[in-house]
């Protein structure tokens, strides 16, 4: 009946909104691990800043567009009622944050292996951090593998534009030191292989351990 259909629509909207809040929360906590903890730990490890203030400002500015697109993303609502469990949500986000830290330190090790200069190493890690952060949302918006559901056009557009802008900056050396093409290609290959596959597998393993967030 029309009345029941309206009630079902309201329930579906509420569950979809809940999923968006969960995705935003996980993304926020993992981003804290990726930016704050990684930058602090790597700077202490190397004895020199891994990112310049310019890198940080650019990264935070470009992240905002994709983060805002979560609010208009098309997410599948849960088939069952969901309950807010902050402790479980933080545990899941922390586990995924540790995974991201491991991936980023592996990228830093690769950057050292290919003998980039110090300014180039900073731009390389900026590129890795930004691309990884953009693609993370594709991981976190879906409980299964990232390709199980399609993001909204706005989210795809924001990710694409941010990726193009960041790549143009490191390729042409605009505002920040330029990277050789082989380093840019390596960053793309690493991020796609690690963020879209390794992180996704880790996410599913964490969900099996703790239950879906």
Model-identified regions with their sequence ranges:
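Membrane-embedded transport module
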Residues: 1-145, 169-172
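C-terminal transmembrane module of polytopic membrane proteins
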Residues: 116, 120-213
